[in-house]
Amino acid sequence: MGSLFDGIGGFPLAAERCGIKPLWASEIEPFPIEVTKHHFPDMIHVGDITLLNGAELPPVDIICGGSPCQDLSVAGARAGLAGARSGLFMEQIRIVKEMRQAEIERGHTGVNIRPRYMVWENVPGAFSSGEPKGEDFRIVLDEIVHVVCPSSHVNQWFSYGWQQVGWHYEDNKCSLAWRCLDAQYWGVAQRRKRIFLVADFAGPTAPLLLFDALPNQEVKNES
């Protein structure tokens, strides 16, 4: 696993507990880097995300990232993905594309193209940010689907906004699923809701991974 916007290593900690090796991390703040160096001494620190080339990074099966949330948060100025901080989400997409293209050029195909999976975490304000309301989250879904299906388009399904749980299939080419989780139910003594989105770039397993079950095909939310 590779961790972008790594902070103090939340994704590497979760990965390690699940038997997944955190191979490298991108972070620019000195103190968080020292924290992760202490807890994950074998993890490579690759530096500023804007200076990275996905084709040159060690290939990983999963790329995780919680891109800066300030421009999406209801507590901020709501600049959305056009903001300098939350707009860094596009750097995560760029790196995924660059790594996958390099893998294709090495002769890998199908499920063997890395990264197969991407995980994105952010604030629930992403559901309502943008114009029209919720457009930023639609763009997030669009950009993730475009990694493998560049001509596809994800529509906003509900005029009153996005649901806190949803999924999308692009034939058998890729799938993505998201859910809003509250830290108070996961061993943390505070209320802290966050969106967690999983994408599978080679199959239909994203809902299975995030929900531990495939959604009912008759009621799935598809564009």
PLM region descriptions:
Residues 10, 14-21, 39:
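A short, Lys/Arg-enriched amphipathic alpha-helix followed by its capping loop at the start of a domain
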Residues 52-60, 72-223:
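Class I S-adenosyl-L-methionine
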Residues 60-66:
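Short SAM/SAH-binding signature in class I
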